[in-house]
Each structure stands twice: as C-alpha cells, then as structure tokens.
C-alpha cells in the first residue's frame, strides 16, 4: 500500500493571492492570515508572493484563470467575502465563484485555496476572519502549501 501525504513547507513555491476589495476590512484579515501561514509555516519568501486586488468576488475566477495560464505560480489563494442580503445575488455570486475556481484548479492541475467567506451577516464574516483563530485565509494557505507538495510527489513518482 502506498500512502502519499506531505508537510506544508514549500519555501521555493511561487504563490499568487487574489483578494477582493469589496468588504476589504474583513478581507484584510483573511490576507494577513494567509501571509502569516505562507511565511511562518511554509517558509515562502516575500519575493515569491504576489498579491492582486480585484473589485469583487465575481472577478476571482477570471483573475485565477489568468494567473493559472501564466504558468508563473505553483498555487493561488482566492480570498473574499460574500454576505447574504435580501436578494438572490448572494447565491449567484457564491455559486459562480466557487464553481469557477474549482474548474480552473482542475483544468490546470493547480492548487487554488478557497478562502471565500459566505456568511449570513457581518458578525459571522468577522468571526471567520479572526486574527487568532478560525481564519479561513490561513486555512486556504495551508491547503495550497500541502497540495503543492502532494502534486510534486505524484509528478515525481514512477
């Protein structure tokens, strides 16, 4: 039986982080969580991290596709917040963003960390972007680091 698993150190990895400007005060916390994990746990150097600010969550799949086809990055982290309103706009944006990022990841065999918060209210968004715990940006960064290493192991195994 073969078991493949990996750690989260990827000190030579090149990472792009796409961050949504809308709800920036929440997304700044997600970004800080992702950067903390990349540097402290993944040992990723500043010069290997690119941050791209986009207008809204709906734009995340497009920028992720552009980053993927550039072949400059080993992984992408998508960060944003969609808060439920009184229209179906929330469901539309969340679904399109989620399915778009998943499709791009699979089509390009490229890890994309899903750090898109979908919450009922601002309190939930603040809680899930916590500085000390429950930061979904941190979780997305950890997933990307591990998947970068797992994909390398699979590629290099015979």
UniProtKB/Swiss-Prot annotation:
(2S)-2-hydroxy-3-oxobutyl phosphate binds at residue 128. Its EC number is 2.5.1.78. The active site is at residue 89. GO terms for cellular component: cytosol; riboflavin synthase complex. Pathway: Cofactor biosynthesis; riboflavin biosynthesis; riboflavin from 2-hydroxy-3-oxobutyl phosphate and 5-amino-6-(D-ribitylamino)uracil: step 1/2. 5-amino-6-(D-ribitylamino)uracil binds at residues 22, 57-59, 81-83, 114. GO terms for biological process: riboflavin biosynthetic process. CDD domains: Lumazine_synthase-I (cd09209). GO terms for molecular function: 6,7-dimethyl-8-ribityllumazine synthase activity. Keywords: Riboflavin biosynthesis, Transferase. It catalyses: (2S)-2-hydroxy-3-oxobutyl phosphate + 5-amino-6-(D-ribitylamino)uracil = 6,7-dimethyl-8-(1-D-ribityl)lumazine + phosphate + 2 H2O + H(+). InterPro entries: LS, LS/RS, LS/RS_sf. Catalyzes the formation of 6,7-dimethyl-8-ribityllumazine by condensation of 5-amino-6-(D-ribitylamino)uracil with 3,4-dihydroxy-2-butanone 4-phosphate. This is the penultimate step in the biosynthesis of riboflavin. Forms an icosahedral capsid composed of 60 subunits, arranged as a dodecamer of pentamers. Belongs to the DMRL synthase family. This is 6,7-dimethyl-8-ribityllumazine synthase. It comes from Blochmanniella pennsylvanica (strain BPEN). The gene is ribH.
């Amino acid at each position: 039986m073969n078991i493949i698993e990996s750690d989260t150190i990827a000190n030579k990895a090149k990472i792009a982080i796409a961050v949504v400007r809308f709800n920036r005060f929440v997304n700044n916390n997600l970004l800080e969580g992702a950067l903390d994990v990349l540097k402290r746990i993944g040992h990723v150097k500043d010069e290997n991290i690119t941050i791209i600010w986009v207008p809204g969550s709906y734009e995340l799949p497009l920028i992720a596709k552009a980053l993927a086809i550039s072949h400059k990055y080993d992984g992408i982290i998508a960060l944003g917040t969609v808060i439920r309103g009184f229209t179906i706009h929330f469901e539309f944006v969340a679904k399109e963003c989620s399915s778009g990022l998943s499709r791009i990841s699979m089509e390009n065999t490229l890890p994309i960390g899903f750090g898109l918060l979908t919450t009922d209210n601002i309190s939930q968004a603040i809680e899930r972007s916590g500085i000390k715990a429950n930061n979904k940006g941190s979780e997305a960064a950890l997933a990307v680091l591990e998947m970068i290493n797992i994909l390398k192991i699979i590629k290099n195994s015979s």
